[in-house]
């Protein structure tokens, strides 16, 4: 049975995760997000037609030349389930690729994964986008923030990036690992607060990491059970949602009844274009 890792903070975990005890607030006060999200943010809006989801891109522009991408039209939105990878070294070549992406007629919005340069990502300014907070990479490219809920085509999307690198030791030794890949308690608290405001009900969930309880279905091992895994298990039990999309596993597979591992597929969130 899955043991909720949050219990180490305040004893037995409450039956409903969406009411946090004061002790948890005291423990995490020192980890308050230093970025003040408020009046400095500007709203970035627009209309869209279809919403699609794909998996880890790892900075590979050839993915945008695949036949699956041809279905995207002007005004559509492509959601990426982590490891976007096009913001890595700030090289001239990388800037040229980002310029190409910025010329797409559709919007690209991604949650972060484990293989990201978080120092560079955090240099982009925060804006309000579709009811939530995102980092503005380009006029049509947005980095979705952990725990935010976005309203797209009258549907609510809960986004939560980050996770744990399986190649942590190698990447740490080579200087390509960032501590920010692992969600903080403050980010989880913000997510719970936003879910509370929406009565623990969203339409779709976009993450990089899969819920740990799916490991047998996926044929992969979750070697590290971090706070994010406990949090996701409680979302499964406590939240109402239609579909949950995640990357990380580099496979395209549907796990009944609501889970979608995505990699190279470009899946429509809904079945048909209006």
Regions found by a protein language model. Name each.
Residues 12, 19, 26, 36-40, ...:
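Short, positively charged and aromatic/hydrophobic N-terminal segments
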Residues 51, 77, 155, 203-204, ...:
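Structural motif
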Residues 57-58, 84-85, 114-117, 163-164, ...:
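Catalytic metal-binding/acid-base residues of hydrolase active sites
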Residues 54, 59-152, 221, 228-232, ...:
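Core catalytic region of metal-dependent phosphoesterases/phosphodiesterases
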Residues 47-52, 148-159, 256-260:
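Beta-strand-turn-beta hairpins that frame and shape the catalytic cleft
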Residues 132, 139, 152-223:
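Active-site-proximal loop/helix segment associated with metal-binding centers of metalloenzymes
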Residues 107-111, 133-139, 212-274:
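Conserved beta-sheet core of the metallophosphoesterase superfamily
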């Amino acid at each position: 049975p899955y043991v909720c890792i949050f219990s180490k903070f305040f004893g037995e975990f409450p039956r409903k995760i969406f009411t946090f005890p004061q002790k948890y607030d005291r423990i995490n006060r020192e980890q308050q997000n230093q970025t003040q999200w408020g009046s400095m943010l500007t709203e970035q809006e627009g209309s869209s037609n279809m919403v699609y989801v794909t998996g880890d891109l790892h900075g590979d522009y050839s993915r945008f030349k695949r036949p699956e991408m041809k279905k995207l039209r002007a005004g559509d939105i492509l959601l990426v389930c982590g490891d976007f990878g096009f913001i890595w070294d700030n090289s001239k070549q990388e800037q040229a690729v980002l310029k190409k992406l910025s010329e797409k007629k559709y919007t690209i919005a991604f949650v972060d994964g484990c293989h990201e340069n978080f120092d560079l990502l955090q240099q982009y300014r925060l804006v309000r986008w579709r009811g939530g907070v995102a980092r503005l990479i380009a006029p049509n490219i947005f980095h979705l923030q952990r725990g935010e809920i976005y309203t797209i085509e009258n549907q609510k999307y809960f986004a939560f990036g980050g996770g744990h690198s399986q190649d942590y030791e190698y990447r740490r030794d080579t200087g390509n690992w960032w501590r920010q890949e692992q969600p903080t308690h403050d980010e989880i608290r913000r997510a719970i607060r936003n879910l509370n405001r929406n009565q623990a009900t969203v339409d779709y969930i976009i993450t990089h990491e899969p819920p740990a309880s799916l490991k047998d279905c996926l044929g992969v091992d979750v070697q590290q059970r971090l706070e994010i895994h406990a949090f996701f298990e409680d979302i499964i039990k406590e939240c109402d949602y239609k579909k949950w999309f995640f990357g990380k596993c580099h496979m395209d597979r549907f796990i009944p009844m609501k889970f979608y591992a995505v990699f190279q597929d470009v899946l429509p969130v809904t079945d048909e274009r209006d």
